[in-house]
Amino acid sequence: MAPPAKRAKRGWVPPGYKYLGPGNSLDQGEPTNPSDAAAKEHDEAYDQYIKSGKNPYLYFSPADQRFIDQTKDAKDWGGKVGHYFFRTKRAFAPKLSTDSEPGTSGVSRPGKRTKPPAHIFVNQARAKKKRASLAAQQRTLTMSDGTETNQPDTGIANARVERSADGGGSSGGGGSGGGGIGVSTGTYDNQTTYKFLGDGWVEITAHASRLLHLGMPPSENYCRVTVHNNQTTGHGTKVKGNMAYDTHQQIWTPWSLVDANAWGVWFQPSDWQFIQNSMESLNLDSLSQELFNVVVKTVTEQQGAGQDAIKVYNNDLTACMMVALDSNNILPYTPAAQTSETLGFYPWKPTAPAPYRYYFFMPRQLSVTSSNSAEGTQITDTIGEPQALNSQFFTIENTLPITLLRTGDEFTTGTYIFNTDPLKLTHTWQTNRHLACLQGITDLPTSDTATASLTANGDRFGSTQTQNVNYVTEALRTRPAQIGFMQPHDNFEANRGGPFKVPVVPLDITAGEDHDANGAIRFNYGKQHGEDWAKQGAAPERYTWDAIDSAAGRDTARCFVQSAPISIPPNQNQILQREDAIAGRTNMHYTNVFNSYGPLSAFPHPDPIYPNGQIWDKELDLEHKPRLHVTAPFVCKNNPPGQLFVHLGPNLTDQFDPNSTTVSRIVTYSTFYWKGILKFKAKLRPNLTWNPVYQATTDSVANSYMNVKKWLPSATGNMHSDPLICRPVPHMTY
């Protein structure tokens, strides 16, 4: 007889929870709610404290504080009880003495400031005398709102010298600079780990870290800007174009967006290859982010002998970087993957946040003057004044709490738990005509080249929806459902904001270069996001993403469309082949014929596109919501992760006039490290077929798309990253 299975220790855990309570095991499965998840992190931290020789039960620890922060908005009774229990402990228990908190699955307290080490002030005293001779020559470079930074003459650029300041003297902002400021407050991690949980389930933990550079915004003001990217400036007459008008209004803000919502931020190419080849489904689990090792520097410029210019960089211990997290999703949602402005895809290369801006309502009146020639046709675009009915102007300062970080500080977002539907990582080859049982054959073939015969169509059994016809054929048989759908392609919607293209669900390519008619997505991107670093010129690199043939249930090369309604078995002249002309087109497109989006339609999520594709998206706040989004495969059923904003606090000079239209600022910039943890839940793909399946792999064939040289650096470090296949393995839909 087999020994009984060992049960996990539950401890004193109330009903409905797995970890909220003392004495339980750390392997109880998935937490039941966010409070239980916080309790699991708390238990893991306690376990690490005990292993390091410390007693967290008698002392108040950072893990206790983190649990308080994570349960402050708890709606469940257990989370509320635990929250107030540890608040009481904080009031009476002594603080746990520790130099560094043991590593756990959680995050540290937001905005906690590290005390500067004593050697900083020693360095300041030593450097003060060295810089005394330079102080009289230093001139503070100022910037005015809406003006460019003063730049030296490019003709003497080769004579410029840039160096760091010696030691740590006082900078223009009153802070201390130079010489080893602060203490490291985090780790730099870009690994992807796989934890196999049993029953085919896998927990994928993607770590990502980047060094970010944040400069001063051109202005400290919010600006409502009207954009005209065309030959005519102002509100004049515009020549007819190809729906390329960029006219709109936007609110430009002095803030920047730290956006990690792209596959290339989290996975290296080999991880993507492993996941696509090995996993059957994928779903988002949780996200946490952290900013640490903040360094704020000021720049002063002095003139040496002749025209030699010297820039001096000083660490500023009192200047600050402002951080805001829109955890309630109040502000306009602007995912940066759609403009290729997420964090860069190369962990060893510094990157920058994206300037934050959002659309603003703009009343417009379009009138067209027709002409026999395209050149003579003109469109008059009249832009009206803002309307009270639709105007929405948001400021971050009035909407969100803002944390001020100085050199050495850190900020954490806490853990966000996703609520999304799983994504299949396999594709389907089955169309409607591959559903249900097949007709029986009369005789088996007698040779490998022979074909089989079916029973005469008038003698077959089965159901059809054709009246007064006794035939039962493959074309006439009823099927359980419709696989795949499309919307009319090449359609432009128009409203007060102007025309825009209707999203199209991807299908396979019908003919030639006709990608857009079947929902192919065009990506334009720069060197931070996969463009060849050796490429010259300003034009971005581009590629077109086509879904795998029949991934949406349509394979035009192997199917046909019949005229409707069907009353008799169709003649050849009633069958539309892909070579037939429809509506003046030289090739056949299903989207010219019908729109099959209805209650009988079954269809997959859009492809996850590596590396440039967006991962998750925000659900539209309307009563009737779309069943999918074209731009991302995961749609959050509640609020998505809050947008993370950063902004350098204005570093003012002594020349400040509150009534002036300009603000005199010390030239300041910041570097800081960003770190994130994105967790997924995946299901291993079972091996079912006799034949080997198609896999994503590389080769050494010259000019091959999957030539491994694409993902290897050159002698000077140049490289680029092309998109990798997704959903390579087929699965049975029915």
Swiss-Prot record:
Bias-annotated ranges (Polar residues): 25-35, 97-107, 140-153
Name of the protein described by the UniProt record: Capsid protein VP1
InterPro entries attached to this UniProt entry: Capsid/spike_ssDNA_virus, Parvovirus_coat, Phospholipase_A2-like, VP1/VP2
Ranges of Basic residues composition bias in the record: 1-10
Entry's Gene Ontology BP terms: clathrin-dependent endocytosis of virus by host cell; microtubule-dependent intracellular transport of viral material towards nucleus; symbiont entry into host cell via permeabilization of host membrane; viral penetration into host nucleus; virion attachment to host cell
UniProt-annotated binding residues for Mg(2+): N328
Membership in a protein family: Belongs to the parvoviridae capsid protein family.
A cellular component annotation (GO) from this entry: host cell
Pfam families listed in its UniProt record: Parvo_coat, Phospholip_A2_4
Annotated organism of origin: Hamster parvovirus H1
Region (Phospholipase A2-like): 19-64
Domain comment (free text): The N-terminus of VP1 is sequestered within the mature capsid. It contains a phospholipase A2-like region and putative nuclear localization signals.
Keyword set, alphabetical order: Capsid protein, Clathrin-mediated endocytosis of virus by host, Cytoplasmic inwards viral transport, Host nucleus, Host-virus interaction, Magnesium, Metal-binding, Microtubular inwards viral transport, T=1 icosahedral capsid protein, Viral attachment to host cell, Viral penetration into host cytoplasm, Viral penetration into host nucleus, Viral penetration via permeabilization of host membrane, Virion, Virus endocytosis by host, Virus entry into host cell
Localization, UniProt: Virion; Host nucleus
Residue numbers covered by motif Nuclear localization signal: 4-13
GO molecular function, one term: structural molecule activity
Region annotation (Disordered) ranges: 1-42, 95-116, 134-154
General function of this protein: Capsid protein self-assembles to form an icosahedral capsid with a T=1 symmetry, about 22 nm in diameter, and consisting of 60 copies of two size variants of the capsid proteins, VP1 and VP2, which differ by the presence of an N-terminal extension in the minor protein VP1. The capsid encapsulates the genomic ssDNA. Capsid proteins are responsible for the attachment to host cell receptors. This attachment induces virion internalization predominantly through clathrin-dependent endocytosis.
Family annotation (Gene3D superfamilies): Parvovirus coat protein VP1/VP2
